[in-house]
């Protein structure tokens, strides 16, 4: 019995890992996670506070970095061991950063190779071509628009339209009316003496009215178109003028200054005064 018990203790002590070995339970879990390369998992970031207890595994880290990022083969094993001992969680991040820098450097190199052909033709070759191309175009535009700005409208010859002989004298008289007569302003014309004892009626400059019939120098009567009074004041001025002007009546001119309504009363009052005076 004693021998069996001693053999049991001996086997237990031999099987127990008294010295830290490279293959531990954590390493076995890392190896299982490293087999899932397609998922691109980061096993060192999943361990949390146990990172300080994990010794650096150069072989496993090399396989891990090569599996995730193939561009890290340039790093040596000693550098990986140092990074694993100091910051094991940030190793893939530094690798990705270095790979990104390498990718950027790879992108910059073709640009640097392409830029020298672009910078070879200096500005001395470009500027004369630009000036020689733009200057004649600008000069052509200047000569093209030069007559437009210099020729003034009143200097251009006016186009005279020949009048047709079928126009009546009334239409010709309407054409000879000045433009300011259309807005109600008619100047007061002089009254020339006309043979035959007739005189031309003067226009009224205040109301802007004209007589119905204007006598021409030839003696023919032509109806004047402007028969209505024209209000040439502003509507908001507060002055109202009738639209139709009454016909000029000359009856009161030739009548006596004494009112006719008072004249019948004068004999009656005279009779009353005479009857009162009689005894």
From Swiss-Prot:
Domain of life the protein comes from: Eukaryota
Subcellular location: Secreted; Cytoplasm; Nucleus
Chain intervals for the UniProt region annotation (Disordered): 243-279
PTM description: O-glycosylated.
UniProt biased composition (Polar residues): 243-263
GO (cellular component) term, any one: extracellular region
Main location (coarse class): secreted
Location of the region described as Interaction with ARHGEF5 in the Swiss-Prot/TrEMBL record: 127-129
One Pfam family recorded for the sequence: ODAM
Signal peptide feature range: 1-15
Annotated GO biological process: biomineral tissue development; inflammatory response; odontogenesis of dentin-containing tooth; positive regulation of epithelial cell proliferation involved in wound healing; positive regulation of gene expression; positive regulation of GTPase activity; positive regulation of protein phosphorylation; regulation of actin cytoskeleton organization
Positions annotated as glycosylated: 115, 119, 244, 249-251, 255-256, 261, 263, 273, 275
Compositional bias ranges of the Basic and acidic residues kind: 267-279
Tissues where this protein is expressed: Expressed in the junctional epithelium of healthy teeth. In periodontitis, absent in the pocket epithelium of the diseased periodontium but is detected in the gingival crevicular fluid.
Keywords, in A-Z order: Biomineralization, Cytoplasm, Glycoprotein, Nucleus, Secreted, Signal
Family: Belongs to the ODAM family.
Subunit annotation: Interacts (via C-terminus) with ARHGEF5.
Known role: Tooth-associated epithelia protein that probably plays a role in odontogenesis, the complex process that results in the initiation and generation of the tooth. May be incorporated in the enamel matrix at the end of mineralization process. Involved in the induction of RHOA activity via interaction with ARHGEF and expression of downstream factors such as ROCK. Plays a role in attachment of the junctional epithelium to the tooth surface.
Note: ODAM protein is the unique constituent of calcifying epithelial odontogenic tumors (CEOTs), also known as Pindborg tumors. CEOTs are benign but locally aggressive pathologic entities arising mainly in the mandible and commonly associated with an unerupted or embedded tooth. They are characterized by the presence of squamous-cell proliferation, calcification, and, notably, amyloid deposits.
The protein's name: Odontogenic ameloblast-associated protein
Originating organism: Homo sapiens
């Amino acid at each position: 019995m004693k021998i069996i018990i001693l053999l049991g203790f001996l086997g237990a002590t031999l099987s127990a890992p008294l010295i830290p070995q490279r293959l531990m339970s954590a390493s076995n879990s890392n190896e299982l996670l490293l087999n899932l390369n397609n998922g691109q998992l980061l096993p060192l970031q999943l361990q949390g506070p146990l990172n300080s207890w994990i010794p650096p595994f150069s072989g496993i880290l090399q396989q891990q970095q090569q599996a995730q990022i193939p561009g890290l083969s340039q790093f040596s094993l000693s550098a990986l061991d140092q990074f694993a001992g100091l910051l094991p969680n940030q190793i893939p991040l530094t690798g990705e950063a270095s790979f990104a820098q390498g990718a950027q450097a790879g992108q910059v190199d073709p640009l640097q190779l392409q830029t020298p052909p672009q910078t070879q033709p200096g500005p001395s070759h470009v500027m004369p071509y630009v000036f020689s191309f733009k200057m004649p175009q600008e000069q052509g535009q200047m000569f093209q628009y030069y007559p437009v700005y210099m020729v003034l409208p009143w200097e251009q010859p006016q186009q005279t339209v020949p009048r047709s002989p079928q126009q009546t004298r009334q239409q010709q008289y309407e054409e000879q009316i000045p433009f300011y007569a259309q807005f109600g302003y008619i100047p007061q014309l002089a009254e020339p003496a006309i043979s035959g004892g007739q005189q031309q009626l003067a226009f009224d400059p205040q109301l802007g009215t004209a007589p119905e019939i204007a006598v021409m120098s030839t003696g023919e009567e032509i109806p004047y178109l402007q028969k209505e009074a024209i209000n040439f004041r502003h509507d908001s001025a507060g002055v109202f003028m009738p639209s139709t002007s009454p016909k000029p009546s000359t009856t009161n001119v030739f009548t006596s200054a004494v009112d006719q309504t008072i004249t019948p009363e004068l004999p009656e009052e005279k009779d009353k005064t005479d009857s009162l005076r009689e005894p």
